[in-house]
Amino acid sequence: MGIQSSTMKLPLIHEILDYWHLLKPKIMYLVVLTGVTGIIIAPGNIHPLIAVISTLCIALGSGAAGAINMWYDSDIDALMTRTKTRPIPAGKISRSSALEVGLVLSFISVTIMMIAVNYISGILLAISIGFYIYVYTMYLKRRTPQNIVIGGAAGALPPIIGWTSVTGSISIESLVLFLIIFMWTPPHFWALSLLNYHEYEKAKIPMLPVTHGIFTTKIHILVYSILLFPITLLPGLFLKDPVLYEITAIPLGLMFVVQAFQVFKSSISYHYRVMFTYSIIYLFILFTCIMLSSF
């Protein structure tokens, strides 16, 4: 009886994991981190329960956008090695089920944010989800190599949403956090596109290396990385412990530029992968340090 019960539970566990992967959890982790950063560094007080609700809504909104993105992109996901194991092309979840999950989570996250937190945070969450789905996924991604640059605005909104959850208004400080993520996004994804250049070409996605070549992409990565560096120093102007922040942000940022320069010089995929991996670690450490420097 016990063996039969365990056997019956396995398919359920696998199904739950499939739906979890549909929500793009790796992206969700960074989205939640940046959103929580906005909540923590914002002036004023917020009830812990409201902070938790805001964080959950940001997470659900991110997952909703990820699910609808997978629904819309399931045709091109099936063509690329990196994405063909995703739940829809792998045949684990139907397109209709993915769309239903995305729409339901979108409605729940935005509605709860508006009712339990405040209207502006709910509106910004709706804009973030809508921008990622309609502007980036449905329009920009398959039409222009600037898809990542413009579409990155959606992923840069969570710290503003976190900030407005506390204050009810947008500020310069929250816009600085937005700008950091906005400038970080292109070199992060262009490093990935260098790694998967032929995959994007096969799927006819106009990523920068496909439309303008590898050398041009490397120049863009280097330029954006250099421009990102001084922007990441700006939080030191308003954090309570600017010394802690700057002694962390400066070497982190310099290493980011060094990695970008390595990509520029190299034609080895190893350096592209290192740049991509480091960019994730970089953002995680940077925003963690922003939180710690606010106390």
Curated annotation (Swiss-Prot):
Protein name stated in the entry: Protoheme IX farnesyltransferase
Gene Ontology process terms (BP): heme O biosynthetic process
Catalytic reaction annotation: heme b + (2E,6E)-farnesyl diphosphate + H2O = Fe(II)-heme o + diphosphate
PANTHER family from the UniProt entry: 4-HYDROXYBENZOATE SOLANESYLTRANSFERASE (PTHR43448:SF7), PROTOHEME IX FARNESYLTRANSFERASE, MITOCHONDRIAL (PTHR43448)
Disulfide-bonded cysteines: none
Listed pathway(s): Porphyrin-containing compound metabolism; heme O biosynthesis; heme O from protoheme: step 1/1
UniProt-listed InterPro entries: Protohaem_IX_farnesylTrfase, UbiA_prenyltransferase, UbiA_prenylTrfase_CS, UbiA_sf
Function: Converts heme B (protoheme IX) to heme O by substitution of the vinyl group on carbon 2 of heme B porphyrin ring with a hydroxyethyl farnesyl side group.
EC class (word): transferase
Membership in a protein family: Belongs to the UbiA prenyltransferase family. Protoheme IX farnesyltransferase subfamily.
Record membrane topology: Multi-pass membrane protein
Gene3D superfamilies the record matches: UbiA prenyltransferase
Other remarks in the entry: Carbon 2 of the heme B porphyrin ring is defined according to the Fischer nomenclature.
Localization per record: Cell inner membrane
EC number in record: 2.5.1.141
Domain of life: Bacteria
A GO CC annotation given for this chain: plasma membrane
GO molecular function terms attached to this record: protoheme IX farnesyltransferase activity
Keywords: Cell inner membrane, Cell membrane, Heme biosynthesis, Membrane, Transferase, Transmembrane, Transmembrane helix
Residue ranges crossing the lipid bilayer per the database entry: 30-50, 51-71, 93-115, 119-136, 148-168, 175-195, 219-239, 244-264, 275-295
